[in-house]
């Protein structure tokens, strides 16, 4: 039995198995939407859960405006990642073709404007997109020099889906989020 268990573990290390963060079914996290209005911006966010053809998903839309030093809308969830054997995040998404972002905050991103981010582009069709942790870059700006260039996967405390950085109408759906 020990030999068999060893072979199973050896042939299927944890890094090859996905871990669901949110599937809108039996695994859920609490998403909180907000915009740059928390810092004086004028971007507007609408966020709600929808269902279409039997598939439940989160929907975020709104006008992103860079006026008043703004430029983002997002929905973010507190998470606790305790296993560093994963290579990245996988998101089931569709949208209006704009470039969107995943922002990760860690134990070291103590100031609200610090994060590690990576972009992805949507289409109008559902797709799973893999975003490797190696593609996440630390944010620039005030006090970002105190952040390590790479983040500690075990230190992840929140994940945000973000429309950011330019004037545009954001429209994105998310039906799943996993570690891979």
Predicted feature residues:
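Sec-dependent signal peptide recognition
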Residues: 1-6
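Hydrophobic h-region of N-terminal signal peptides that target proteins for export
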Residues: 7-15
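Beta-rich carbohydrate-recognition modules and glycan-binding surfaces
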Residues: 15-180
